[in-house]
Amino acid sequence: MEDLDQSPLVSSSDSPPRPQPAFKYQFVREPEDEEEEEEEEEEDEDEDLEELEVLERKPAAGLSAAPVPTAPAAGAPLMDFGNDFVPPAPRGPLPAAPPVAPERQPSWDPSPVSSTVPAPSPLSAAAVSPSKLPEDDEPPARPPPPPPASVSPQAEPVWTPPAPAPAAPPSTPAAPKRRGSSGSVDETLFALPAASEPVIRSSAENMDLKEQPGNTISAGQEDFPSVLLETAASLPSLSPLSAASFKEHEYLGNLSTVLPTEGTLQENVSEASKEVSEKAKTLLIDRDLTEFSELEYSEMGSSFSVSPKAESAVIVANPREEIIVKNKDEEEKLVSNNILHNQQELPTALTKLVKEDEVVSSEKAKDSFNEKRVAVEAPMREEYADFKPFERVWEVKDSKEDSDMLAAGGKIESNLESKVDKKCFADSLEQTNHEKDSESSNDDTSFPSTPEGIKDRSGAYITCAPFNPAATESIATNIFPLLGDPTSENKTDEKKIEEKKAQIVTEKNTSTKTSNPFLVAAQDSETDYVTTDNLTKVTEEVVANMPEGLTPDLVQEACESELNEVTGTKIAYETKMDLVQTSEVMQESLYPAAQLCPSFEESEATPSPVLPDIVMEAPLNSAVPSAGASVIQPSSSPLEASSVNYESIKHEPENPPPYEEAMSVSLKKVSGIKEEIKEPENINAALQETEAPYISIACDLIKETKLSAEPAPDFSDYSEMAKVEQPVPDHSELVEDSSPDSEPVDLFSDDSIPDVPQKQDETVMLVKESLTETSFESMIEYENKEKLSALPPEGGKPYLESFKLSLDNTKDTLLPDEVSTLSKKEKIPLQMEELSTAVYSNDDLFISKEAQIRETETFSDSSPIEIIDEFPTLISSKTDSFSKLAREYTDLEVSHKSEIANAPDGAGSLPCTELPHDLSLKNIQPKVEEKISFSDDFSKNGSATSKVLLLPPDVSALATQAEIESIVKPKVLVKEAEKKLPSDTEKEDRSPSAIFSAELSKTSVVDLLYWRDIKKTGVVFGASLFLLLSLTVFSIVSVTAYIALALLSVTISFRIYKGVIQAIQKSDEGHPFRAYLESEVAISEELVQKYSNSALGHVNCTIKELRRLFLVDDLVDSLKFAVLMWVFTYVGALFNGLTLLILALISLFSVPVIYERHQAQIDHYLGLANKNVKDAMAKIQAKIPGLKRKAE
């Protein structure tokens, strides 16, 4: 596998990388790799389902066992990527194709993955293949999948990247490298090849990082920086994916390097950040560039730590994940060793890395999945002890990875290695370099497009804490205390902020150019924001995915999004938020480290305007994650974290000035976006309130935001979005109470949460991709989503509606997202690949959005249907969540919202949701959870889901159920109301004329004909018969006159009689017919129209039939009609019309009653008569050939 990776990587990372993009999913691969890629595609589908299972089992065994195998796997890929720039090159070529078909990755992902780790489609492969590529890279470290190593490992990486992200923190360089090999995170970062210059910058910055001590994690990692430079030069030629994957490897490799050289990185990153922001702005023009910048940031994070490997990993979209995983394994070893030397926390990270490597070795068999999960959980939980939120996220990540692993089989094993390596790498990164940890985590998370990518996002979620340089460092300190000394981590917060700024800039530059055009385009729309994000946190690949760099607020939001996205890929503020939240929950429950990240997010989110509720929830969620209620925390933290995170950045003593500055810029740019980011800030604040370390992280984030604010006109816009988002957190609690996000909390509790998060992540990625494609339009769309998320307090409907608008642009993308999410659960590689493509093209944006979504879980209302379905689904179970997301997706489709829930119950997300719809999502987030046109019921569902999100884990589950019931009830009530409306109309019709018509209703007619009321029926029958008989004797004129005289005689007589009586009695009763005179007798228009329309229909039908008969349309029918008329001539001779009417009247009032009383006998004789008639007709037809033929 390494050879395959190296040969293609060499071609793509040196100079072929640019030619490779011409391949567009056609990557130079050995036949074996192509077969493996096909198998990988199939395994990815399996992984989608298995990923959830593996994630569940992975936290315990996976963490402990995976690290060891991961290290070998990482080592091999690391050597490929680190020692030889060649391995990254193949990945570069593979990513080259992804820029064009990032979303098509499902189609080509199999072949690229099989032929080479970088073979999978750059962007699609990046998402789908991330898991696959890690497998390719992993094969050396994973003996079990050797035959299908390239295929099964490649598929596995989908799981692995997430796992490595959580487990990798201890050995950050190794895990990132593996991630680089898998291309899970960095694949997405490099999926966009549009930004050629940024790639070069990233390579230069990578050189700086390489020069820095951290870069010497190992020979492989040292090579990565140089490889990154080579890749930076050649990546532009390479496909964006190739560059992205290679950057991932570089980032993973350099991650350790950056750890020791945080100061240098900070300076470099700061400069690179400015360049990136400028280039991001420039890229904003280019859609591809925007997408690329998304990848670019996450890739930057990876390229700083393991630039060459990151690039090689990114080289292939799907293969990229495998490559990244492989690199991670290699890097895990290198990083673990280097981290041990580089930082005090390194021993812890190394220990975790060793655990994960061991787990990976054991996981080489499917049993290893459980072990890895356990192993990962152990290290993660250690991390969790210090950083509960991250631990939860890591757990979720492991669950996702485990599920993916189970689905992929051999691939899963490889993926587990990748996951474990990534996790180990993330752990060591977190321990050694929080900033790099964040970058590696985010990079790993960057690939959540695939299950692996989602897992990586769990890692990213963990790194999410380091999202902002200072905040990231603080988060790393908080998150990595488990991995290492919290004090040292806290100390590194500022350094991380600086380094991350530099890394983000460098990574953004490198990744933007290296990434696929998709990501480049996405970055163009979100370049500034991404640049700020990258500056803040190179590892925060999610940051790049967030807005393009609108303002510090946006950066902060992106950081939060990265945290959320690491946990679960939820880029769309609403749909994606839910997805992020779901994935976050998954990762939290499955990965202790992942859980730590949600907790961190919550703690940061504590200060949000929604701070009281969010803080309440965030602490609860923080405690819950440790207690296993991480599900609630993610749901609460995504929304809360989004708003609180930004608010905390805003409120932090150190951060507020930068944040205010950023907010000022953002307000100038887009007040709406600023509000959106404010909500994440609020979430950050809440998180900060939850934990002092988180507060410090928030401060770091604020600092980072300030740094990122420098390069962000777009950031300003996004920060305005953040401000819009900030009100949302205030509403977001309401929304969480009434929106899918609260449901996601319950869903997070369930193991199914990982599935929904994946869907949500995919959906977010797709939405983000759409945003990336739309560039500023997508930014606006994002703002709309955020604004909508702010609306959720109003019931979540406005949010849903606005999200519908945004989803209208991203409708197709979101649908594929949810479909991808669903496909992950359902083993649908194509959809997953689409999500991967979206993730690769908009990975950074997605991650940032995911962070924002998680930060502003309330924003889940954006895709309430999808998310709602997904979240309830998560609560119920993976299948339930998936069905809910599917149902949610269906609802969205029906609603035209296409929100994320194709079959809320069946497929949910979903959910809904999820989309989703349910998601897609309850409405569904999904959501699913993502037809933008929500039905009113769907909107209601979304609101209910949001409400549930605010609830604690248990409360969220109950609330989700209640919300689902309420969602169902509103529909039923609406139907009932509609039914009642007719009854009300009938009552209205029951004015004198209405009553008359009612009496003439079918019920009244039946009662008359069956003599239910003998008196009434007798009067009607007698009067009608007398009238007809009179007509037989008198002319109609005479009859009319006599009837009128009779009535007048009666009324006049009665009137005179009453007057005489009143005069005698001296009473003042008044006119005897006063009541009738004053009564309403007018016939309503409706009644006239009703009967006239009915009569008109009959008249028209009769006219048409007569025309057909008289014009001999059918000769036989015309002859029959002629015979009938001939018979009537005889009837007319015997009876006149009145006689026939009299006979009809008598029959009408007699036949029904007789038949009712003697039904059995009559039926018997009628049956005999019919039989005789048929027999006679058959004989006649037999004798007359023409008639027989006609009958036939």
Swiss-Prot record:
Superkingdom of the source species: Eukaryota
Gene name of the encoded protein: RTN4
Keyword list, A-Z: Acetylation, Cell junction, Cell membrane, Endoplasmic reticulum, Membrane, Neurogenesis, Phosphoprotein, Synapse, Transmembrane, Transmembrane helix
Disordered as annotated region, ranges: 1-204, 427-458, 722-762
Role, per record: Required to induce the formation and stabilization of endoplasmic reticulum (ER) tubules. They regulate membrane morphogenesis in the ER by promoting tubular ER production. They influence nuclear envelope expansion, nuclear pore complex formation and proper localization of inner nuclear membrane proteins. However each isoform have specific functions mainly depending on their tissue expression specificities.
Cysteine-cysteine disulfides: none
Membrane topology (Lumenal): 1040-1133
InterPro entries: Reticulon, RTN1-4
Bilayer-crossing regions: 1019-1039, 1134-1154
GO biological process: apoptotic process; axonal fasciculation; blastocyst formation; brain development; cardiac epithelial to mesenchymal transition; cell adhesion involved in sprouting angiogenesis; cell migration involved in vasculogenesis; cellular response to hypoxia
GO CC field: anchoring junction; cell junction; endoplasmic reticulum; endoplasmic reticulum membrane; endoplasmic reticulum tubular network; endoplasmic reticulum tubular network membrane; glutamatergic synapse; neuron projection
One GO MF term: metal ion binding
Protein name: Reticulon-4
Tissue expression notes: Isoform A: is specifically expressed in brain and testis and weakly in heart and skeletal muscle. Isoform B: widely expressed except for the liver. Highly expressed in endothelial cells and vascular smooth muscle cells, including blood vessels and mesenteric arteries. Isoform C: is expressed in brain, skeletal muscle and adipocytes. Isoform D is testis-specific.
Pfam family, any one: Reticulon
Originating species: Homo sapiens (Human)
